[in-house]
């Protein structure tokens, strides 16, 4: 398994709409395994393939406290949304930024697992929010897109400043 590089906002590749997975092959399973390792390495609770420059409809999520219950969603689709919720969200592709995003409180989701078997599940609370956040990535959408242009610009400027600082540190 390998840790993959996570793209950061405003990288245009994050805006790519992911394509469906035609078949769950050993190559797809390796991508899934690498994504899980990357999610854990980055201390995230979810990761979409788009975030690691793989434009396929693959998401991994683990909201467990023990960090050992990864959920794999291949070609995920939200069948139903119910209620309203929202929490202050963060994102591995927008490091250091958090914002309140409106989401459905509950969702019904259909997907394929790591072995290509179809399953359907109900999600609420943090899992419902995480699923919606990660599926947004597959559509080329980020949580900052829900914010005002001013807030989005502030986040972009902050990330650019952090990037410049890190580059200076590496060159020193």
UniProtKB/Swiss-Prot annotation:
NCBIfam families: pept_deformyl, PRK00150.1-3. Keywords: Hydrolase, Iron, Metal-binding, Protein biosynthesis. InterPro entries: Peptide_deformylase (IPR023635), Peptide_deformylase_sf (IPR036821). It comes from Vibrio parahaemolyticus serotype O3:K6 (strain RIMD 2210633). The keyword Protein biosynthesis applies. Disulfide bonds: none annotated. Its EC number is 3.5.1.88. Fe cation binds at residues 91, 133, 137. Belongs to the polypeptide deformylase family. This is Peptide deformylase 1. The active site is at 134. Removes the formyl group from the N-terminal Met of newly synthesized proteins. Requires at least a dipeptide for an efficient rate of reaction. N-terminal L-methionine is a prerequisite for activity but the enzyme has broad specificity at other positions. It comes from the Bacteria. GO terms for biological process: co-translational protein modification; translation. Binds 1 Fe(2+) ion. Its cofactor is Fe(2+). It is an enzyme of class 3 (hydrolase). It catalyses: N-terminal N-formyl-L-methionyl-[peptide] + H2O = N-terminal L-methionyl-[peptide] + formate. Gene3D superfamilies: Peptide deformylase (3.90.45.10). PANTHER family: PEPTIDE DEFORMYLASE. Pfam families: Pep_deformylase. GO terms for molecular function: metal ion binding; peptide deformylase activity.
């Amino acid at each position: 398994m390998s840790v993959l590089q996570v793209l950061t906002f405003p990288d245009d590749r994050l805006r790519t709409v992911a394509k469906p997975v035609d078949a769950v092959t050993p190559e797809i399973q390796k991508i899934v395994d690498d994504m899980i390792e990357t999610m854990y390495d980055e201390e995230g609770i979810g990761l979409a393939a788009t975030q690691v420059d793989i434009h396929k409809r693959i998401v991994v999520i683990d909201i467990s406290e023990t960090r050992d219950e990864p959920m794999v969603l291949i070609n995920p689709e939200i069948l139903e949304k119910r209620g309203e919720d929202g929490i202050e969200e963060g994102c591995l592709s927008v490091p250091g930024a958090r914002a309140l995003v409106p989401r459905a409180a509950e969702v019904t989701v259909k997907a394929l697992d790591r072995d290509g078997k179809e399953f359907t599940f109900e999600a609420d609370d943090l899992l419902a929010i995480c699923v919606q956040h990660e599926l947004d990535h597959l559509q080329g959408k980020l949580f900052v897109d829900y914010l005002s242009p001013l807030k989005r610009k502030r986040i972009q400027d902050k990330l650019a400043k952090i990037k410049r600082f890190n580059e200076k540190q590496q060159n020193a």
